[in-house]
Amino acid sequence: MSARKRVKRANVYDLYRTCKQAGTCPPDVIPKVEGDTIADKILKLGGLAIYLGGLGIGTWSTGRVAAGGSPRYVPLRTSGSTTSLASVGSRAGAATGTRSSITGIPLDTLETIGALRPGAYEDTVLPEAPAIVTPDAVPADTGIDGLSIGTDSSTETLITLLEPEGPEDVAVLELQPLDHANWQVSNAVHQGSAYHAPLQLQSSIAETSGLENIFVGGAGLGDTGGENIELTFFGSPRTSTPRNLPQTARGILNWFSKRYYTQIPTEDPDVFSSQTFSNPLYDPEPAVLKGPSGRVGLSQVYRPDFIETRGGGQVGPQLHVRYSLSTITEDVEAIPIAVDEDTQGLAFIPLHEEPGDFEEIELDDLGEEHALLPKSYTAPIGSGVRRALIPGQGFSATRPTGVVTYGSPDMYPASPVGPDSTSPSLVIDDNTTTPIIIIDGHTVDLYSNNYSLHPSLLRKRKKRKHA
């Protein structure tokens, strides 16, 4: 059984502060802090019986008391006292009938030294003196005998005012900020469009939009030419070993060491079917090891024949059995596919078929139903023309057939509109002003082949009112 370790107790004063109020202090703590021990009691009782106050302990007098008088101890001067040390010594000598003196320091010289006596300036600084002292009321100090120090005071003070050099007028510059016009530029890029129009923003009418494209290597960069660098294929890796190889272990931890292990290469992968290990907790982290052949494989270390000692040690040769994997071969060429004789022939399907004959129809052939037109409407170029669907059922008014000319003498009839017809009709607006809209830097032409319709020709969707 081990001896119990002795722990040092805390300080007595720390214990007293914590255990006094709780009343759990040890018996020796309170008397020591409050001064009530046996030694303290003996000193108190001895002080009552013996009086040592007249010995002059701690008064520099070494216990020598003058005959018929007080000890030679002169108290220090208190605040406001004007009694000098020489006067105290003279009065003490007159009372005793003997001249009191200190060895090596005559009392006559103490009267002339201003270091131990109050000077004339110190005598004026008294509690009953006024708080403000004027310089005229302070008398001049006579100084020490044998020294003459002359002081000449001059009350005249010369003050010279220096005027700045240069002109009196100071230039004041007024700085006003410049008024800048507020400009706001917006740019929209359309993705996935089949046609890229050039950027031509020459007008600020209405709403504009543009498309910016930068072609690298095209004609837009100029005919500066360039250098064609052929693509070089570097050699592919020959083994499956990673580039960052782990550090090779040394000594018995290196399985490829011929000093500790007998290297036995094998080609039978069934050797590793039943892998065992003693304790995986203390095994090193798995890492890919590259063998001498430059290939990655499976390894196993074991002792086929060994002698076990009483302490649990094994004595015998260690074998390192390794199964190396195959290397990465060259690029595999096209392997012909063997076709069985019973395989049916494959049908050839062309990807692009030749177009057939189309039926040509003349545009001037209007048909017999539009031979006679009772009435026609014409609309000038730039007029607001919109298409509207007018249901025929339940419509009481009869509207004639409308025809619109598009800047040419040829007449293109529109579909007739009647009470029993549901085909769309042309509705001519009274407003002949067409808004100008710029799309991709070009003004929209309603009658050109840009495949863009004017917004006024599009049908407007009406919201369905729910009852």
From Swiss-Prot:
<dbReference type="GO" id="GO:0043657">
    <property type="term" value="C:host cell"/>
</dbReference>
<keyword id="KW-0426">Late protein</keyword>
<keyword id="KW-0945">Host-virus interaction</keyword>
<keyword id="KW-0946">Virion</keyword>
<comment type="subunit">
    <text>Interacts with major capsid protein L1. Interacts with E2; this interaction inhibits E2 transcriptional activity but not the DNA replication function E2. Interacts with host GADD45GIP1. Interacts with host HSPA8; this interaction is required for L2 nuclear translocation. Interacts with host importins KPNB2 and KPNB3. Forms a complex with importin alpha2-beta1 heterodimers via interaction with the importin alpha2 adapter. Interacts with host DYNLT1; this interaction is essential for virus intracellular transport during entry.</text>
</comment>
<keyword id="KW-0167">Capsid protein</keyword>
<protein>
    <recommendedName>
        <fullName>Minor capsid protein L2</fullName>
    </recommendedName>
</protein>
<comment type="function">
    <text>Minor protein of the capsid that localizes along the inner surface of the virion, within the central cavities beneath the L1 pentamers. Plays a role in capsid stabilization through interaction with the major capsid protein L1. Once the virion enters the host cell, L2 escorts the genomic DNA into the nucleus by promoting escape from the endosomal compartments and traffic through the host Golgi network.</text>
</comment>
<dbReference type="GO" id="GO:0044177">
    <property type="term" value="C:host cell Golgi apparatus"/>
</dbReference>
<feature type="short sequence motif" description="Nuclear localization signal">
    <location>
        <begin position="459"/>
        <end position="466"/>
    </location>
</feature>
<dbReference type="GO" id="GO:0046718">
    <property type="term" value="P:symbiont entry into host cell"/>
</dbReference>
<dbReference type="Pfam" id="PF00513">
    <property type="entry name" value="Late_protein_L2"/>
</dbReference>
<dbReference type="GO" id="GO:0005198">
    <property type="term" value="F:structural molecule activity"/>
</dbReference>
<dbReference type="InterPro" id="IPR000784">
    <property type="entry name" value="Late_L2"/>
</dbReference>
<keyword id="KW-1177">Microtubular inwards viral transport</keyword>
<dbReference type="GO" id="GO:0075521">
    <property type="term" value="P:microtubule-dependent intracellular transport of viral material towards nucleus"/>
</dbReference>
<dbReference type="GO" id="GO:0075732">
    <property type="term" value="P:viral penetration into host nucleus"/>
</dbReference>
<keyword id="KW-1160">Virus entry into host cell</keyword>
<keyword id="KW-1015">Disulfide bond</keyword>
<comment type="similarity">
    <text>Belongs to the papillomaviridae L2 protein family.</text>
</comment>
<keyword id="KW-1039">Host endosome</keyword>
<feature type="short sequence motif" description="Nuclear localization signal">
    <location>
        <begin position="1"/>
        <end position="10"/>
    </location>
</feature>
<keyword id="KW-1163">Viral penetration into host nucleus</keyword>
<keyword id="KW-0238">DNA-binding</keyword>
<feature type="disulfide bond">
    <location>
        <begin position="19"/>
        <end position="25"/>
    </location>
</feature>
<dbReference type="GO" id="GO:0019028">
    <property type="term" value="C:viral capsid"/>
</dbReference>
<dbReference type="GO" id="GO:0042025">
    <property type="term" value="C:host cell nucleus"/>
</dbReference>
<keyword id="KW-1176">Cytoplasmic inwards viral transport</keyword>
<keyword id="KW-0597">Phosphoprotein</keyword>
<dbReference type="GO" id="GO:0044174">
    <property type="term" value="C:host cell endosome"/>
</dbReference>
<dbReference type="GO" id="GO:0003677">
    <property type="term" value="F:DNA binding"/>
</dbReference>
<keyword id="KW-1048">Host nucleus</keyword>
<keyword id="KW-1040">Host Golgi apparatus</keyword>
